[in-house]
Amino acid sequence: MSEKTVKVQLVKSLIGTRESHRATVRGLGLRRLNSVSELQDTPAVRGMINKVSYLVKVIG
């Protein structure tokens, strides 16, 4: 059975955000505006997405 995945896209700039939030976005594998990363759907990843929910969008 395949692992469940979640795609996230960076939709807001990191300028003016907290350093810890920038590090979280980098941890999600996102670099530039509108970049997309596909990650395993784990509680840790969900928590990271929740922390920076105002910067990212979950796709599909």
UniProtKB/Swiss-Prot annotation:
Keywords: Ribonucleoprotein, Ribosomal protein. GO terms for cellular component: cytosolic large ribosomal subunit. One of its GO terms (biological process) is translation. GO terms for molecular function: structural constituent of ribosome. CDD domains: Ribosomal_L30. Pfam families: Ribosomal_L30. It comes from the Bacteria. InterPro entries: Ribo_uL30_ferredoxin-like_sf, Ribosomal_uL30_bac-type, Ribosomal_uL30_ferredoxin-like. PANTHER family: LARGE RIBOSOMAL SUBUNIT PROTEIN UL30M, MITOCHONDRIAL RIBOSOMAL PROTEIN L30. Belongs to the universal ribosomal protein uL30 family. Part of the 50S ribosomal subunit. This is Large ribosomal subunit protein uL30. It comes from Paraburkholderia phymatum (strain DSM 17167 / CIP 108236 / LMG 21445 / STM815) (Burkholderia phymatum). The gene is rpmD.
